[in-house]
């Protein structure tokens, strides 16, 4: 039988003091009741909840999990339940629920109970036989004596020193925790809940004397003040061992492990107690985790009746703290009286139940429930909830009357210009902060305070707290900041430092706590305001009055937006301050650290705000949609909104003419695409936002949506810039080639293009017939026919450009329809127009990324370990585009060694976004055998990367480097350089290859070029080339003998074969070179040498590691930090590039070993920092991605990272970023529009005059004829000619595009004039939404799949292409 449970509470402590006695517990929440759907939630641990959903108070109370009735168990005979074997961990802890419990039919002498038996405890034990009394000795031990802690001896739990030891037949883990905000509302409930259970289970039905002994023992125990001190502070921790009903925990397997003895230690004695760290990661959720299986290392079943030193010391320290810090709490007397009345009533009910019938038991059960509800509603929510909120708010220091105002002293004389500018920026910081604090005070004083005092209340207390949640805490954070700021401002002229004040003030957890909860609640608060404005005119009138009374007429919404905008403002101010802080200034490093802190904080807040808004919008869409099934579909927890856009749907007829247009709203969710018509409900008040309803047009799975782009056929990517003579290579032919993907462009433009293609075909037939002529005619021969063909080809190119220009805002989607009668799939087409070209490009890229995320290979792409919300969200995970071998011949002996990426300038066009919109170049990959090397060139010119060339090299390739085109500064009007690109190496991009034999080879790298080696020369003493780096005028080679060779450019643009300078650094190989502004960083051994580019002298030296034998292998720079990796070990080190200070160490083995079984040794084999990620290739073949800031601050790792499930079968040898050149090469752009090589001379001759003729014709009659000859001739001759192409012209602006009636409607709606020049300008404004990263190694595998021996062909050199979403660009 069970003695009454005891609730022990800790005094009211602040967070720092709680950490002293809470056994270093990271998670201090007791097991909460299952919350209702809209139940109010508070989270003192700052865990990331679903933003925008925290505060919805419309739901009633729900019975806690511990108070629910157990499911009825089937009847069995005898005491079989007590003899049932204990379930093992492998059974997922299900035994506590599935073991049948015997229902007694009569009182019998019970058998001895196994302490590890599984017993289902119902509220009054009506389904259980009386717990047997094993022996008189055990009876004297204390079966009927109440205690402070229920101590299941097999688990080795702690017992108060003044209480006897018990031998219970069942147990549950001791819970040691601190109550959170919402738990305070449940603590008294647990008190009242579990006391009657204890009574009902402990009082024997045959003896009332035992009850008296219990009461007297309880009275003696309660007489000790140390044992009743907990009642003075009912707000703190609970030490409780009362078994919960329907508990999922296994009584025979406890969650605490013997740390000292490991698996062999079964004793929890004074010598082998628990360390306090054992409580670090255990919370009450462990019970639920047992249901899914706890790791065996955390389970223990062989314990003895001993005490732990740690828990004894913990108890003594806890009792001392209680005596020292105990304070009276309002309402304690009432709670005690209520508890005594309830206990007395429960004792009578239990006694009546034991002597009564089954009907009496049911009445008792109902009475207990009513008692619980009474305790919950009367004594708790009405009284303790408000005090609990006030207590939580008091955790923040009230500094309203303590902070001085920051005043900048008068400017002294003799300051430098930089000091003057810094003082002005400091003044901006002070003024900005003062205005911000005033805005926060206005929220509280002009809105919250009057609303709370208003009678009758227009906002309930609950809604008032929701609207102004955490504003006071944010104000207190900034009041503390103002204290530090005022102190620093007063001594500015002597200190001139501000960065450390920002770091100290905004790196505190309380700042992130307050802002995070404010941002998470913002959407809910705004929704409450909108709803109240619409339903209560008095509230709307109050807002109007306050706005009109304010000097700047700022609305409440604008004031509430200021906390969300605050950190971006800080970042801009600190960036200005940093720009005016010279290197070597003591404030420079603190400013960079402050930028890092603020950027990390702002990024988290922005992401949470975005997530909250998206989830809130999904809920609003679900409410406003007219389809019930879609409402349920949108309510799914795993579905989130990517974006919603207003577009104009265009309906065409069979001839390509516009029939009608209609405004639509297109919703892109992570797996569904929906199109709806927006219908607004008008409101009588213009200030009240009218509610919107959506009439659904269609919804389709996102994975089945295809965006059809003009010219998006396979293989056209390579030909789009160098179109061939023959029309089948033209982009326009795609419309006829694929009937199921017919492109529906502007009607007249499309028809003109079809006419041109028809005429080109006719001219081809005429050309053949002319060849059959017997006579020789001056104006009718093969040369004239070629002129006709060339002129038509130019017209086709121009017309395609016009269509692309018209398509800069057009999106054509192929969508799945219903199956036809034969069961075959059908498709329908929808054409939309966006309002700007940038929206279209962004939308198509979002579609491509969302579809990529739905692919099977990305369902389990990365393993993440959550770290208090600092993990990378799934929406930002790199997505695997694909993997491919990079060998032409099947020669598996080649192994990947290095790579270099050559970005290509390309004619950007918004109408042609593809999956590789940020990569249009070539990846050169070097592979090696033991004696020779091989180079494979992979093209990223179209949507599918492919190997375009592969050739061998005489020696093993150890390093590669891309050398861009040398920037030439020509005077305006100067003649072009007469040298050809084939002769001058600096006019074309090149790839430098360093080999083991000590040679450097220079290869030409440009589109369409085959293997062209421009140079080949040897290093001094033919020393092996380990690394390469370059500037525009110098090439540097790190050699195996510890030297760096510097080569200068020759007058013809090539590299001198003899080094300009050889810089000797040491005897160890120079494994890594890195250019940083005007210095070269060279790693030799464990040191980094900083070499001046101008003087070739060593300016500085960095010792990266003090241990002997640590050799630097890789370096990566970002902002003002440099990450350094070593050939052995798994540690990365971060150093400041200006002061060379050691800032951070990261061990990548930690996340890798969390995913991979065992503890395999690993090292870093490649390194890359890009777009907020530090990507690390490992010797085990897996990638590790760690989050880092993106601005010019310090790139420290800001959270635990991710480990890729996609891996190579060998070390990851390289990680490169595939970028695109954003600046266009105008010469190449012009060349790309030139006709093909045949007949090249005639085309070059005719290009200029033909363009002039077209331009002149475009100003006249749109039906004027086109001249296709090789000379202009006279206007009379041209007027006598005719053309079937009608209104065609060579001008960039087509008359059909501007004046045709069927096209005018859509362009009037879009208000977007179309021209090639404006198109080119818009292309520069468009922002990329993703980036490509390529890694290489041997083969490809999925981690955690069934291990099998890979085939030989699976070990071929392979690259994996990743696409990284850029959410914050």
From Swiss-Prot:
GO biological process: actin cytoskeleton organization; centrosome duplication; mitotic spindle assembly; myelination in peripheral nervous system; positive regulation of Rho protein signal transduction; positive regulation of stress fiber assembly; regulation of small GTPase mediated signal transduction
Residues found modified as N5-methylglutamine: 1338
Chain residue ranges for the region called Disordered: 1-106, 184-254, 1226-1260, 1277-1297
Protein's recorded name: Rho guanine nucleotide exchange factor 10
Annotated disease: Slowed nerve conduction velocity: Affected individuals present a reduction in nerve conduction velocities without any clinical signs of peripheral or central nervous system dysfunction. SNCV inheritance is autosomal dominant.
Function statement: May play a role in developmental myelination of peripheral nerves.
Organism in which the protein naturally occurs: Homo sapiens (Human)
Bias (Acidic residues): 46-64
Bias (Low complexity): 83-100, 1279-1296
């Amino acid at each position: 039988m069970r003695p009454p449970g005891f609730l022990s509470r800790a005094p009211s402590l602040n967070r720092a003091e709680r950490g002293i006695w809470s056994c270093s517990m990271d998670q201090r929440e007791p097991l909460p009741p299952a919350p209702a759907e809209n139940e109010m939630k508070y989270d003192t641990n700052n865990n990331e909840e679903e933003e925008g959903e925290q505060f919805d108070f419309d739901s009633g109370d729900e019975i806690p999990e511990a108070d629910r009735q157990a499911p009825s168990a089937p009847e069995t005979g005898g005491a079989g339940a007590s003899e049932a074997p204990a379930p093992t961990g492998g059974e997922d802890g299900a035994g506590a629920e599935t073991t049948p419990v015997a229902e007694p039919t009569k009182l019998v002498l019970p058998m001895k109970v196994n302490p590890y038996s599984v017993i289902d405890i119902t509220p009054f034990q009506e389904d259980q036989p009386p717990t047997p009394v094993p022996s008189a000795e055990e009876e004297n031990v204390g079966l009927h004596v109440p205690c402070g802690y229920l101590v299941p001896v097999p688990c080795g739990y702690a017992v108060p020193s003044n209480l006897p030891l018990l031998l219970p037949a069942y147990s549950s883990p001791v819970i040691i925790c601190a109550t959170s905000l919402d738990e305070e509302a449940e603590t008294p409930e647990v008190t009242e809940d579990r006391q009657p259970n204890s009574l009902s289970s402990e009082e024997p039905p045959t003896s009332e004397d035992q009850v008296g002994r219990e009461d007297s023992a309880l009275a003696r125990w309660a007489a000790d003040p140390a044992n009743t001190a907990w009642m003075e502070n009912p707000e703190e921790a609970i030490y409780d061992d009362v078994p919960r009903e329907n508990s999922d925990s296994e009584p025979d397997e406890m969650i605490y492990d013997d740390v000292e003895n490991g698996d062999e230690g079964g004793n929890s004695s004074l010598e082998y107690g628990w360390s306090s760290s054992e409580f670090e990661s255990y919370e009450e959720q462990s019970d639920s985790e047992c249901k899914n299986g706890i790791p065996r290392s955390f389970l223990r079943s062989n314990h003895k009746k001993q005490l732990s030193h740690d828990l004894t010391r913990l108890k003594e320290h806890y009792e001392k703290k209680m005596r020292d810090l105990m304070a009276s709490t309002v309402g304690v007397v009432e709670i005690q009286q209520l508890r005594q009345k309830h206990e007395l009533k429960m004792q009578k009910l239990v006694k009546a139940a034991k002597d009564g019938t089954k009907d009496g038991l049911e009445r008792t059960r109902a009475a207990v429930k009513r008692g619980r509800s009474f305790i919950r509603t009367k004594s708790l929510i009405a009284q303790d909830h408000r005090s609990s909120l006030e207590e939580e708010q008091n955790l923040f220091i009230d500094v309203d009357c303590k902070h001085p105002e920051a005043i900048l002293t008068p400017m002294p004389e003799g300051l430098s210009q930089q000091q003057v500018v810094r003082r002005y920026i400091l003044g901006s910081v002070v003024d900005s902060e003062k205005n911000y604090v005033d805005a926060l005070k206005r929220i509280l004083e002009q809105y919250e305070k009057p609303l709370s005092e208003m009678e009758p209340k227009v906002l309930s207390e609950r809604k008032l707290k929701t609207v102004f949640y955490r504003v006071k805490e944010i104000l207190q954070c900034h009041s503390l900041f103002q204290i530090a700021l005022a102190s620093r401002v007063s001594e500015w002229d002597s200190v001139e430092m501000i960065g450390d004040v920002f770091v100290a003030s905004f790196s505190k957890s309380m700042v992130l706590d307050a802002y995070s909860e404010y941002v998470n609640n913002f959407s809910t608060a705004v929704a409450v305001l909108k709803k109240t404005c619409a339903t209560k005119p008095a509230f709307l009138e109050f807002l109007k009055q306050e706005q009109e009374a304010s000097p700047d007429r700022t609305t409440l919404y604008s004031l509430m937006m200021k906390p969300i905008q605050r950190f971006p403002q800080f970042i801009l101010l600190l960036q200005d301050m940093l720009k005016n802080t010279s290197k070597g200034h003591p404030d420079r490093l603190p400013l960079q650290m402050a930028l890092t802190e603020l950027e990390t904080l702002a990024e988290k807040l922005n992401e949470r705000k975005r997530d909250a808004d998206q989830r809130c919008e999904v809920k609003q869409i679900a409410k406003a949609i007219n389809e019930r099934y879609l409402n349920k579909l949108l309510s799914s927890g795993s579905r989130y909104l990517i974006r919603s856009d207003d577009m104009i749907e265009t309906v065409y007829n069979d001839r390509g003419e516009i029939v009608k247009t209609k405004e639509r709203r297109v919703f892109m969710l992570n797996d569904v695409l929906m199109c709806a018509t927006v219908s607004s409900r008008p409101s009588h008040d213009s200030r009240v936002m009218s509610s919107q309803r959506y009439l659904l047009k269609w919804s389709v799975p996102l994975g089945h949506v295809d965006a059809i782009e003009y010219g998006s056929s396979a293989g056209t990517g390579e030909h789009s810039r160098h179109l061939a003579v023959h029309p089948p290579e033209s982009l326009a032919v795609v419309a006829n080639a694929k009937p199921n993907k017919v492109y529906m462009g502007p009607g007249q433009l499309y028809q003109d293009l079809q006419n041109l293609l028809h005429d080109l075909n006719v001219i081809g037939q005429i050309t053949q017939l002319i060849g059959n002529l017997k006579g020789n005619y001056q104006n009718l021969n093969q040369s004239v026919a070629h002129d006709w063909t060339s002129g038509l080809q130019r017209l086709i190119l121009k017309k395609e450009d016009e269509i692309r220009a018209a398509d800069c805002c057009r999106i054509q989607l192929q969508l799945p329809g219903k199956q036809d009668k034969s069961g075959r799939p059908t498709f329908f087409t929808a054409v939309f127009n966006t309002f700007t070209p940038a929206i279209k490009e962004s939308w198509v890229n979002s579609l491509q990324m969302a579809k990529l995320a739905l692919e099977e290979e990305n369902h389990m792409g990365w393993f993440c370990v959550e770290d208090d919300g600092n993990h990378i969200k799934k929406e930002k995970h790199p997505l695997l585009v694909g993997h491919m071998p990079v060998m032409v011949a099947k020669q598996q002996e080649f192994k990947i060694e290095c790579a270099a990426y050559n970005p290509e300038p390309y004619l950007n066009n918004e109408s042609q976004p593809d999956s590789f919109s940020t990569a249009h170049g070539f990846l050169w990959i070097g592979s090696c055998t033991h004696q020779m090397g091989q180079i494979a060139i992979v093209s990223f010119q179209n949507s599918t990367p492919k190997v375009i060339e592969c050739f061998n090299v005489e020696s093993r390739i150890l390093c590669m480097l891309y050398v861009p085109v040398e920037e030439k500064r020509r005077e305006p009007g100067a003649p072009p350089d007469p040298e050809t690109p084939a002769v001058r190496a600096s006019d074309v991009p090149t790839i430098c290859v360093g080999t083991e034999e000590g040679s450097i080879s220079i290869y030409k790298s440009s589109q369409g070029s085959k293997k062209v080696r421009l140079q080949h020369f040897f290093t001094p003493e033919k020393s092996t080339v380990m690394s390469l780096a370059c500037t525009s005028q110098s090439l540097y080679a790190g050699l195996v003998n510890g030297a760096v060779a510097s080569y200068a450019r020759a007058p013809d643009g090539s590299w001198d074969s003899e080094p300009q300078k050889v810089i000797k650094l040491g005897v160890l190989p120079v494994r890594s070179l890195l250019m940083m502004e005007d210095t070269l960083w060279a790693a030799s051994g464990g040191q980094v040498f900083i070499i001046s580019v101008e003087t070739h002298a060593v300016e500085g030296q960095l010792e990266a590691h003090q241990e002997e034998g640590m050799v630097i292998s890789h370096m990566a720079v970002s902002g003002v930090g440099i990450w350094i990796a070593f050939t052995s070990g798994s540690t990365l080190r971060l150093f400041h590039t200006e002061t060379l200070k050691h800032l951070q160490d990261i061990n990548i083995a930690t996340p890798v070993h969390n995913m991979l079984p065992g503890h395999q040794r690993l090292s870093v084999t490649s390194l890359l920092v890009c777009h907020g990620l530090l990507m690390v290739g490992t010797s085990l073949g897996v990638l590790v991605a760690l989050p880092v800031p993106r601005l010019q601050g310090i790139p420290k790792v800001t959270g635990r990272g991710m480990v890729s499930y996609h891996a190579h079968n060998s070390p990851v040898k390289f990680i490169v970023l595939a970028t695109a050149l954003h600046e266009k090469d105008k010469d190449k752009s012009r060349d790309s529009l030139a006709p093909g090589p045949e007949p090249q001379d005639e085309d070059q001759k005719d290009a200029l005059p033909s363009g002039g003729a077209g331009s002149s014709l475009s100003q006249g009659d749109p039906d004027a004829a086109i001249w296709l000859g090789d000379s202009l001739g006279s206007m009379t001759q041209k007027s006598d000619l005719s053309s079937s192409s009608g209104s065609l012209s060579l001008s960039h602006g087509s008359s059909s595009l501007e004046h045709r009636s069927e096209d005018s409607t859509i362009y009037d709606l879009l208000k977007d004039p179309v021209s090639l020049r404006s198109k080119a300008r818009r292309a520069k404004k468009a922002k990329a939404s993703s980036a490509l990263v390529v890694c290489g190694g041997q083969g490809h595998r999925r981690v955690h799949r069934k291990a099998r021996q890979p085939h030989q062909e699976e070990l071929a050199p392979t690259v994996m292409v990743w696409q990284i979403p850029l959410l914050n660009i």
